[in-house]
């Protein structure tokens, strides 16, 4: 009937009582609500990875053909957690056109900026090495599918990879533990 339902997936609350929410089919970022329950703003929006081939086709396609192309939407957030200092930690899927992990874990400050330290040998995005194709049956391919995150009191954080059933724990500098 054309009705769009608000479908919240995860929430976190800071020390002042502000509520942060991620919802299905919300691409503008994490929603922040005042203590009164009124909407305040979006923060921490994921970026769209540019697809050069798609840009090329849009220059030569007709308007009808362009309309049939998939929209370039940023990846949705999959989970959020709040640490004791009021920073939001968030996980997201990789962009559909991404060929590498692209900051699928973020530490978001009150300005909405990602301030995650990524000083480790690999970025804190789950599996650093993975197969993209395989002819063998039963081989899992693709980047980690991050669906969960939690933060400890000392700043370590653990992410959950649903694809391979793994947990990855990192320190506050982004080093895998």
Predicted feature locations:
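Eukaryotic scaffold repeat domains enriched in small/polar residues
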Residues: 1-177
């Amino acid at each position: 009937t054309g009705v769009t339902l608000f479908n919240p997936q995860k929430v976190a609350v800071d020390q002042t009582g502000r509520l942060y929410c991620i919802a299905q089919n919300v691409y503008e970022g994490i929603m922040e609500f005042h203590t009164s329950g009124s909407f305040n703003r979006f923060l921490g929006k994921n970026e769209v990875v540019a697809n050069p081939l798609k840009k090329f086709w849009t220059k030569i396609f007709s308007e009808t053909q362009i309309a049939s192309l998939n929209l370039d939407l940023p990846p949705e957030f999959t989970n959020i957690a709040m640490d004791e200092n009021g920073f939001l930690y968030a996980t997201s899927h990789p962009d559909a056109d991404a060929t590498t992990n692209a900051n699928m874990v973020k530490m978001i400050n009150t300005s909405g900026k990602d301030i995650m330290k990524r000083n480790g040998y690999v970025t804190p995005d789950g599996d650093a090495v993975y197969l993209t194709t395989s002819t063998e049956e039963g081989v899992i391919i693709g980047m980690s599918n991050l669906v969960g995150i939690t933060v400890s009191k000392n700043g370590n954080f653990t992410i959950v990879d649903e694809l391979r059933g793994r947990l990855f724990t990192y320190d506050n500098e982004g080093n895998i533990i």
